[in-house]
Amino acid sequence: MAEQREDRRDGRGGHEGAPEGATEGVREGARPRGSGAGEEEARAWDVLVATARRTVADGLVVGTSGNVSVRTGDIVLVTPSGVPYDRLTPADLTAVDLDGRQVRGTLVPTSELPMHLAVYRHTDARAVVHTHAVHATAVSTLVAELPLIHYMAAALGGPVRVAPYATYGTEELAENMLRALDGRSGCLLQNHGTITYGATLDQAYDRTAQLEWMCRLWLTASSVAGLTPTLLSEGRLDEVAQRLRGYGQRS
């Protein structure tokens, strides 16, 4: 979702768009960085901010749209609602528990918190990236599943599904997303954008970038008049999945 663009760090912003229960303890019990956040959380916050800024620099979001989170233990650090990423500082650390109760910071968490928490509750994710990437969002309006235009769909677990549309920030959207993510590490959100997860923020981000690239590839190939793109079979994709298990450097 495109977060509200009002910079709420002065504490005067309301809680519009935050999920029920997410703002409990914002004034009482929620602690800013330095009065509860340990070194691990501080480092994780720095990486989260860098990743959020990267989504803007790489054109995956505009303004304050999209959101990023990372899990440390049973705490989820998440981008706040409506604050431009280039203005986020160490003092802006925002975190909730797995029930959505705010435990760090005074800024209102992203309105898409239900999606992030649903991913953490139902998968082994340690990081989540949600964007409004242009080509991926365009594809989400055209098909129910991204056609198998490239073998790197295997890196996301198989053919990428499109979660049916639901209003941003709702449990309905989170439920639709979970169904689309079954057996996958990423999906498209109809008329909305992308969501991916991984063991690290780098992995989640790379999956987002790969998904956007595949969507751009399919749109480009299918735009050629009189020709139809060659697609891969799921059997071919399974072969790639096997090879990817041994891909890269090993320690």
Regions found by a protein language model. Give the residues of each.
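Glycine-rich flexible loops
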Residues: 2-11, 20, 24-251
